[in-house]
């Protein structure tokens, strides 16, 4: 899952560094503009091996062999620029950070659960951001 288009290289950076196994931010923007969900369907039908998305956090499930790896470009912190977060910070500053951390944690698990839909299901969780892996390890200890 890609948190932001700017987590990806642009087409110039891809050429300059010879990047092959990633999508450019321009190509992802084109995919995200497709309202038909063509790429999600192609991924679910195994027509493509990799799905890059900023939008597969809710409402789309990838059970069983449909998805065995989930890559987080970074920890899914909430967008604090939204009016909700600004109002909360002003009206209830003592609860702001607790709520913020809880929201981020729930977003992390929501994205993981896109690929986990039954007891025997599994996914590999990958990320260059150690906060993702640390949070997962910490939370999974509390579950088991």
Model regions: which residues?
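Conserved RecA-like P-loop NTPase helicase motor core
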Residues: 29, 35-133
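Conserved strand-helix element at the start of the C-terminal RecA-like helicase core
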Residues: 1-15
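Short, low-complexity, polybasic intrinsically disordered segments
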Residues: 133-144
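Conserved RecA-like helicase motor-core motifs
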Residues: 13-40
């Amino acid at each position: 899952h890609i948190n932001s288009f700017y987590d990806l290289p642009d087409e110039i950076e891809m050429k300059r560094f010879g990047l092959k196994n990633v999508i450019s931010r321009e190509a992802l923007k084109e995919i995200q503009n497709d309202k038909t969900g063509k790429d999600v369907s192609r991924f679910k039908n195994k027509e493509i091996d990799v799905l890059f998305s900023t939008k597969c956090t809710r409402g789309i499930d990838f059970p069983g062999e449909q998805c065995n790896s989930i890559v987080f470009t970074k920890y899914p912190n909430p967008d604090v620029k939204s009016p909700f977060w600004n109002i909360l910070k002003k009206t209830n500053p003592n609860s702001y950070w607790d709520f913020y951390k809880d929201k981020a944690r729930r977003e992390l698990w929501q994205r993981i659960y896109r690929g986990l839909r039954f007891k025997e299901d599994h996914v590999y969780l990958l990320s260059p951001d150690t906060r993702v892996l640390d949070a997962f390890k910490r939370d999974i200890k509390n579950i088991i």
